[in-house]
C-alpha cells in the first residue's frame, strides 16, 4: 500500500491558481527536496528531470516534482508553503526553467553592496531579484506590480512589520538558461541535468582549487587575503599537495590575466574556482591592463586617460567638444597641440579592444568549456539570473564539467 502511495501522481487543482501537478517522492527519507518546474520545461525535458529526481533520491532526499503554468511568484510560494508543512521536512528546492522572478524593494539594508535610491531610479534598476522571497518564509511582502515589458518579473515591497534579517527556511537554487546564448533552451536544460546526474555519480574528491583576485578588489591590499589561506586549508585539506592543486592567482601576475584564467578553467582536474573581482551581469572585471613603463609610457597613459574623460563629457553633452577641450587644457595646463590627435571613433575602438582584453565577457564563455565543478563569484551582478545573459549561467550551460555556480 505504501509503495502504491509513493508511486502515485497527485494532482491538486487550486481555485484561482490553475492546475498544479505534484509527483510525490518515490522513496522515503529523513528530509525532502522539491523540484519546481514550469509545465513547458517539464514537457520538453521530462526524462532528464526524472533522472535528476532519481539522483537526488539516491542521495537520500525524498524528492517532489511540482509543475504548473505559473502566473506569479505568490502561486509558486503557496505550493512551497504547503510542501514545507508536510513530513518529511523540506530541506531545499530548485527552480528549473521559467519560474517567475520576485524583485524586492525596501530591503537594501539586507544587501551587501547594492545601494540605489529607489525614489530616483526606475524599478528595474533599483529593485533586487531574490529567491529569498521563496526560501525565507519568515519574511512578508506586499505586491506592487508586474513589469510591463518583462512579464516574468514581479515587484514586491518588504513590509515594515516583517522580520528584517535573512533566515532562510531551506536552501534554494535556480537552473535557468541564459537565452542570450541562443540555441534550444530546453535541450540545454536537459543536457545540463544529465551532466549534473553524471557528476553526482562520480567519486570525485575535492582536491584541486584555484583562488583569483581581480583589480580594485579590497583596495588591492594583499594583506587582506592573508587569512583566506587559513580558511581554505581548513575547508579543502586534500588540496594542499602541490602548487597546481592549491593555487592563488592575482591580477598583477600578467598584463592580461584572463587568458591565464582560461587555461585554469579548462583543466579537467579542477574542482573549485573562486573569483574575487568586480562584476556586471555580462562581465568579470579581471585586470586593468599593463602598467605604464618609462617616461613615454606614463605620458601616453595620461594622454589616453584625458582623451577618454573628454569623450565621456562630450557624450554626456556637458558642452561643445571645443568648450570641453578648452576646459581640460586650462585645468591641467596642457599644451596647445595636446588634442591634435583626438578622435571619438579612434578612442572608442581602442577602449573597446582594451576592455575585451581586461575582462571575461559572455562571448568568451560561449566558446569555453569550464571544468571546475563549483565556481564562486565573489562579485556584483555575475549571478543576475533575471537577465537574458548572465555570467553564472554561461558557466554551467556549456560542454564542460561545471555544475554549480554561486553569485
Predicted regions mapped to residue ranges:
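Bacterial Sec-dependent N-terminal signal peptides
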Residues: 1-20
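Cysteine-dependent hydrolase recognition
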Residues: 19-407
Amino acid at each position: 500500500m505504501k509503495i502504491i502511495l509513493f508511486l502515485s501522481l497527485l494532482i491538486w487543482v487550486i481555485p484561482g491558481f490553475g492546475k498544479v501537478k505534484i509527483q510525490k517522492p518515490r522513496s522515503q527519507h529523513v528530509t525532502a527536496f522539491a523540484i519546481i518546474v514550469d509545465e513547458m520545461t517539464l514537457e520538453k525535458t521530462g526524462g532528464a528531470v526524472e533522472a535528476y529526481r532519481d539522483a537526488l533520491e539516491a542521495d537520500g532526499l525524498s524528492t517532489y516534482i511540482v509543475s504548473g503554468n505559473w502566473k506569479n511568484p505568490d502561486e509558486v510560494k503557496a505550493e512551497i508553503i504547503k510542501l514545507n508543512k508536510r513530513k518529511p521536512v523540506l530541506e531545499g528546492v530548485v527552480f528549473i526553467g521559467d519560474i517567475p522572478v520576485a524583485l524586492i524593494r525596501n530591503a537594501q539594508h539586507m544587501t551587501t553592496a547594492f545601494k540605489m535610491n529607489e525614489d530616483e531610479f526606475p524599478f528595474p534598476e533599483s529593485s533586487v531579484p531574490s529567491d529569498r522571497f521563496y526560501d525565507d518564509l519568515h519574511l512578508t511582502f506586499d505586491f506592487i506590480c508586474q513589469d510591463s515589458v518583462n512579464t516574468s518579473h514581479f515587484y514586491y515591497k518588504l513590509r515594515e512589520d516583517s522580520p528584517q534579517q535573512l533566515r532562510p527556511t531551506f536552501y534554494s537554487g535556480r537552473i535557468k538558461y541564459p537565452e542570450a546564448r541562443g540555441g534550444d533552451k530546453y535541450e540545454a536544460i536537459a543536457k545540463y541535468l544529465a551532466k549534473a546526474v553524471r557528476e553526482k555519480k562520480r567519486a570525485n574528491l575535492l582536491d584541486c582549487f584555484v583562488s583569483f583576485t581581480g583589480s580594485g578588489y579590497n583596495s588591492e591590499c594583499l594583506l587582506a587575503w592573508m587569512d583566506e589561506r587559513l580558511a581554505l586549508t581548513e575547508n579543502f585539506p586534500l588540496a594542499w599537495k602541490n602548487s597546481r592543486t592549491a593555487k592563488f592567482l592575482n591580477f598583477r601576475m600578467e598584463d592580461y590575466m584572463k587568458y591565464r584564467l582560461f587555461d585554469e578553467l579548462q583543466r579537467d582536474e579542477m574542482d573549485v574556482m573562486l573569483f574575487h573581482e568586480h562584476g556586471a551581469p555580462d562581465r568579470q572585471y579581471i585586470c586593468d591592463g599593463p602598467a605604464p613603463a618609462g617616461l613615454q609610457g606614463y605620458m601616453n597613459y595620461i594622454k589616453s586617460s584625458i582623451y577618454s574623460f573628454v569623450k565621456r563629457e562630450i557624450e554626456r553633452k556637458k558642452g561643445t567638444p571645443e568648450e570641453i577641450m578648452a576646459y581640460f587644457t586650462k585645468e591641467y595646463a596642457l599644451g596647445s597641440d595636446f588634442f591634435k590627435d583626438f578622435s571619438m571613433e579612434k578612442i572608442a575602438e581602442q577602449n573597446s579592444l582594451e576592455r575585451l582584453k581586461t575582462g571575461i565577457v559572455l562571448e568568451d564563455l560561449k566558446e569555453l568549456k569550464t571544468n571546475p565543478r563549483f565556481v564562486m563569484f565573489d562579485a556584483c551582478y555575475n549571478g543576475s539570473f533575471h537577465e537574458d545573459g548572465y555570467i553564472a549561467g554561461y558557466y554551467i550551460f556549456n560542454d564542460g564539467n561545471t555544475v554549480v555556480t554561486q553569485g
